[in-house]
Curated annotation (Swiss-Prot):
GO terms for molecular function: rRNA binding; structural constituent of ribosome. The gene is rplU. Keywords: Ribonucleoprotein, Ribosomal protein, RNA-binding, rRNA-binding. Belongs to the bacterial ribosomal protein bL21 family. Part of the 50S ribosomal subunit. Contacts protein L20. This is Large ribosomal subunit protein bL21. It comes from Thermosipho melanesiensis (strain DSM 12029 / CIP 104789 / BI429). This protein binds to 23S rRNA in the presence of protein L20.
Amino acid sequence: MYAIVESGGKQYRVEPGKVFFTERILGKNEGEAITLDKVLMVKTDEGKLLVGKPYLENVSITGTIVEHGRARKVLVGKFRPRKNYKRIKGHRQWYTAIKVENIEVK
């Protein structure tokens, strides 16, 4: 069984027992339970495919927040030829790791 869920403006494929990384979720601490309600699609173990318009109302995904952290540094550079101008800037994006416990179809 797997599902497509929307979190942080992006879509993720999630399965029970797996960990996925999403944009940082504020207001929740590590170890707390979380419920994701914006489920776009579910494929059940019986092979049944449920698709929402845009979301499924009878499906919820429960999970646990594993950690909050920052991703690896991404370097962005500007360069102007023949002008002796060069600029490097780094960025580290915040993320939240969520372990999916259960996909419940009501």
